[in-house]
Amino acid sequence: MKHNIINLAQDLIRRPSVSPDDQGCQQVIAERLAQLGFTLEWLPFGDTLNLWATHGTQDPCVVFAGHTDVVPVGDETQWQYPPFSAEIVDGTLYGRGAADMKGSLAALVIAAETFVKNNPNHKGKIALLITSDEEAAAKAGTVKVVETLMARQEAVHYAVVGEPSSGKVLGDVIKNGRRGSITGELYIEGVQGHVAYPHLAENPVHTSLNFLTELTTYQWDNGNEFFPPTSLQIANIKAGTGSNNVIPGELYVQFNLRYCTEVTDEIIKNKVAEMLAKHQLKHRISWNLSGQPFLAGNGELVKATVQAVENVTKITPRLDTSGGTSDGRFIALMGAEVVEFGPLNATIHKVNECVSVEDLGKCGEVYYHILERLLKS
């Protein structure tokens, strides 16, 4: 299985699929799956290509999810090996997307192929959800596929996202959930004027200080067994014209919350509105909800993944919900248990991104064992 994984990973890496350009990656995968009797459905939205490939028609449905798009390479002269050459040196595969996530995508595909070959009459359904819009806008990829599936009431019970979850060694971390993410764009209105005549103006920076102190020190919750406490950070703040003699007429504050399952986006919005009213600030605010929190807890998929990792790596993984958002947040909306498991994340989005060849082989084994536990007849 490892040999096939590496060959496919190299083929994918050699295609410069900077988001959202797929560069033929999904076609390569689709042709392989078609030979094994997978039903293929192309779901393009705008300039994004999505593939929904299934084998079997019964419940439960196990989804392997991944993306073919990669981030830009930056200055190519800084790379030890050309970023789209997929060089293997001393057991390490180099290239943009090697770790995030063409390597683990290849492992997911080969694991599904191998399982179907060995178990052609398996129970349930295996599905691969592959998109070319994860690294950029993430507006026309997995979220659109999920909307399509939900509209026709197609069930998904379990989903394994091949994101690079491991920290120091393969298998040390499984993501069994993610925090929600919501961003506020706040404008506090004042009255512009000359700094020498403050009585004729109203400085929104000054009037907002107490509010901003309350906003940044408020304790939203204490977290829980699976999540750390909700965190708020001011990301951008701007006021003034750049001149030292003009009192600004408006203050702009952009802030983000990474929130756990102890609160909801509505609770957050209402509390911020309450604070603004308390401090009597003339304002306007808009919100962008990037994703709701999701949690697989200690469900069947988590148990299957932990057991598979232990069998293959001889390591007991730590369950973790930290880090940024992933496409798992969209699949979780279907009521599915979602986990993320993949190779080390130490080099993702960096110059000289790379992954261990041995680790990719083991990823494939883990994915195969998950299917065995959940779908073997």
Curated annotation (Swiss-Prot):
Classification via InterPro entries: Bact_exopeptidase_dim_dom (IPR036264), DapE_proteobac (IPR005941), Peptidase_M20 (IPR002933), Peptidase_M20_dimer (IPR011650), Peptidase_M20A (IPR050072)
Keyword Metal-binding: yes
Chain residues that bind Zn(2+) 2: 100, 135, 349
Cofactor note: Binds 2 Zn(2+) or Co(2+) ions per subunit.
Reaction(s) this enzyme catalyzes, per UniProt: N-succinyl-(2S,6S)-2,6-diaminopimelate + H2O = (2S,6S)-2,6-diaminopimelate + succinate
Cofactor: Zn(2+); Co(2+)
A biological process from GO: lysine biosynthetic process via diaminopimelate
Active site: 69, 134
CDD domains, sorted: M20_DapE_proteobac
Similarity comment: family membership: Belongs to the peptidase M20A family. DapE subfamily.
Subunit structure: Homodimer.
Role: Catalyzes the hydrolysis of N-succinyl-L,L-diaminopimelic acid (SDAP), forming succinate and LL-2,6-diaminopimelate (DAP), an intermediate involved in the bacterial biosynthesis of lysine and meso-diaminopimelic acid, an essential component of bacterial cell walls.
Protein name (record): Succinyl-diaminopimelate desuccinylase
Gene: dapE
